[in-house]
Amino acid sequence: MADAASQVLLGSGLTILSQPLMYVKVLIQVGYEPLPPTIGRNIFGRQVCQLPGLFCYAQHIASIDGRRGLFTGLTPRLCSGVLGTVVHGKVLQYYQESEKPEELGSVTVQKEYSSSFDRVIKETTREMIARSAATLITHPFHVITLRSMVQFIGRESKYCGLCDSIVTIYREEGIVGFFAGLIPRLLGDIISLWLCNSLAYLINTYALDSGVSTMNEMKSYSQAVTGFFASMLTYPFVLVSNLMAVNNCGLAGGSPPYSPIYTSWIDCWCMLQKAGNMSRGNSLFFRKVPCGKTYCYDLRMLI
């Protein structure tokens, strides 16, 4: 119980601290560029035309809504985080308790099993089920979080309170509205998890020397590196999921010119890929302006 409470508190603290970052990221993912590009330098010192970074973007939001505005959507996101942590822990606890009778077997067999790829598959499968269950239950809060952020673009107040947002979504879209963008989000999580754990196992088994004294530390590093690599590869699923969650929901940020009306998440994926926007919002610094791209800032000036 104490471990669960500490995880909830730690997760809530990190959620609060990262809220402004996520807010900016979501607006960029939608395609909202309120500030004009500037001439800057990339990490190699070369002059390039850049879009505003995280701090300039956050300062723009704060100049309109104040610093408190940077924490828009925090309440449903906290609810999602707390509920997700509890569900994830309960599912893993169920598997651990169901495995206890099997622990009476031979110690030698247990050691051989623990070092095999079968154990990696078993643990990854359990983690996948736990994460998927948490994602499925908390996705309605995720949708509300995204929509409350995106309404900054059109200065709407459609999704302000948690209860009012639930009523609005149910009245306009039914139960299905609470799960907009769920499929690409689940697929991204599952692919990322399996890719991360499989690569970490291969590195730890075949690339690292088991006789090294810092073996455990090196394994933790390899897990972190493979996790970062997997998240980079599966980022398009995150982008598509977030866009589908706000698409055609009655907000300016989910409608043209910021976002086309997508018929499905596959349609969204194809259109982003065709436009070369599969990594939009992945970087919050050194955001180079792609050649031939038109942003909402330019469209606003033409109106």
Curated annotation (Swiss-Prot):
It is found in: Mitochondrion outer membrane. Pfam families: Mito_carr. GO terms for cellular component: mitochondrial inner membrane; mitochondrial outer membrane; mitochondrion. This is Mitochondrial carrier homolog 2. One of its GO terms (biological process) is hepatocyte apoptotic process. Belongs to the mitochondrial carrier (TC 2.A.29) family. Residues 2-15, 93-135, 200-231 are mitochondrial intermembrane. Keywords: Acetylation, Apoptosis, Membrane, Mitochondrion, Mitochondrion outer membrane, Repeat, Transmembrane, Transmembrane helix. The modification N-acetylalanine is found at residue 2. Expressed in a wide variety of tissues. Predominant expressed in liver, kidney, heart, skeletal muscle and testis. Solcar repeats lie at residues 2-98, 118-206. Its main location: mitochondrion. InterPro entries: Mitochondrial_sb/sol_carrier, Mt_carrier_dom_sf. The chain crosses the membrane at residues 16-36, 78-92, 136-156, 181-199, 232-252, 281-303. It comes from the Eukaryota. Interacts with p15BID. Protein insertase that mediates insertion of transmembrane proteins into the mitochondrial outer membrane. Catalyzes insertion of proteins with alpha-helical transmembrane regions, such as signal-anchored, tail-anchored and multi-pass membrane proteins. Does not mediate insertion of beta-barrel transmembrane proteins. Also acts as a receptor for the truncated form of pro-apoptotic BH3-interacting domain death agonist (p15 BID) and has therefore a critical function in apoptosis. Regulates the quiescence/cycling of hematopoietic stem cells (HSCs). It is a multi-pass membrane protein. GO terms for molecular function: membrane insertase activity. Disruption phenotype: Mice homozygous for a knockout allele exhibit abnormal mesoderm development, disorganized extraembryonic tissue, lack of amnion and chorion formation, decreased embryo size and lethality at around 7.5 dpc. Conditional knockout in the liver decreases the sensitivity of mice to Fas-induced hepatocellular apoptosis and prevents the recruitment of tBID to liver mitochondria. Conditional knockout in skeletal muscle results in increased mitochondrial mass and metabolism granting protection against diet-induced obesity. The keyword Nucleus does not apply. PROSITE patterns: SOLCAR (PS50920). The keyword ATP-binding does not apply. The gene is Mtch2. Residues 37-77, 157-180, 253-280 are cytoplasmic.
